[in-house]
Design a protein with these regions (language model features):
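The conserved beta1-alpha1 loop
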Residues: 19-21, 86, 226
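Conserved serine/cysteine hydrolase catalytic core
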Residues: 180-243
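Catalytic histidine-centered segment of alpha/beta-hydrolase-like enzymes
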Residues: 256-265
């Protein structure tokens, strides 16, 4: 069986696996990873949209991505890792840690796509009656997303005015733009991550009832970092997590949204390091 596609960012210290979000290739997180590499050896699986020739039509939920992650960890034959994941990356990491907790020293979820069961029920009903693509706002955005660009400087000027990037520095925004694009052989640039894959992942999400069932008995040290302006890991999810497992720590960052690791890379790295240092002493 072929090796799971992954990156190795280098660094010093114990192994830290980082898993990116939907539509955000690993290169988008170079600012965050730079702030972690002095303390940890950083590597990470690439989600299937970034695999050459990967098929999406037979994927009905996100569970296979956790199987991919566990296979990568098994192939590398390393000891317990620190698992860090953003958005879907957090969900994939959490599910993998629930299935094989001995492979994880700690888990850090960056604004995970973990919605309460009532919200998932609504989405699953909408999807079942065939109108999911019409009502999901991120799917509509992905479908309209521009795929090709003449140059990256004009992309930067355009993106700099978008409210979604309001808390990102110029440097982080440029890293993001470089991360989501690649040069075309005929000139110009195109998206690395296709809108078709991005849409498919949105459509097959919010089926995480197993995670809510497993939280009560989950004992891997866990930290959730959320943004106070997020539209993803909502206050009702925070409440339910705390109700099910009081050992899980939750940190809310000010002036931060769902893309907080790109908005505040140094601050997020510092929170991660402080948590892991405290856990190693306990």
């Amino acid at each position: 069986m072929n090796q799971i596609p992954h990156f190795d960012f280098g660094g010093n210290g114990e192994p830290l696996h980082f898993l990116h979000a939907n539509g955000y290739p690993p290169e988008c997180y170079s600012g965050l990873l730079e702030h972690l590499k002095d303390n940890y050896h950083l590597f990470g699986m690439k989600l299937r949209p970034l695999w050459d020739g990967a098929k999406k039509d037979d994927l009905r939920d996100w569970h296979p991505y956790s199987e991919d992650l566990l296979r990568l960890l098994s192939d590398r034959e390393i000891g317990p890792v620190i698992g860090v994941g953003h958005s879907i990356g957090g969900i994939v990491t959490l599910r993998a840690a629930m299935r094989e907790p001995k492979r994880f020293r700690a888990v850090i979820l960056l604004d995970p796509v973990l919605f309460v069961p009532s919200t998932m029920n609504t989405w699953n009903f909408v999807r079942a009656i065939g109108v999911g693509e019409k009502v999901h706002p991120l799917i509509q955005t992905a479908k309209r997303r521009r795929r090709e660009f003449t140059d990256l400087e004009s992309v930067f000027r355009s993106y700099r005015t978008k409210p979604v990037f309001r808390y990102m520095s110029d440097e982080s925004l440029k890293q993001y733009i470089e991360g989501i694009t690649k040069p075309k052989s005929t000139g110009g640039y195109e998206l690395v991550y296709t809108p078709e894959w991005e849409t498919h992942i949105y459509m097959t999400g919010m089926r995480d009832y197993d995670l809510w069932r497993g939280l009560a008995n989950f004992d891997v040290p866990t930290l959730i970092i959320r943004g106070d302006e997020t539209d993803t890991f909502m206050p009702n999810a925070e409440y339910l997590v705390k109700k099910k497992n009081q050992k899980i720590q939750i940190h809310t960052m000010k002036k931060a949204t769902h893309i907080l690791p790109l908005e505040h890379p140094k601050e997020v790295a510092d929170i991660i390091k402080d948590f892991l240092t405290t856990e190693s002493r306990s």
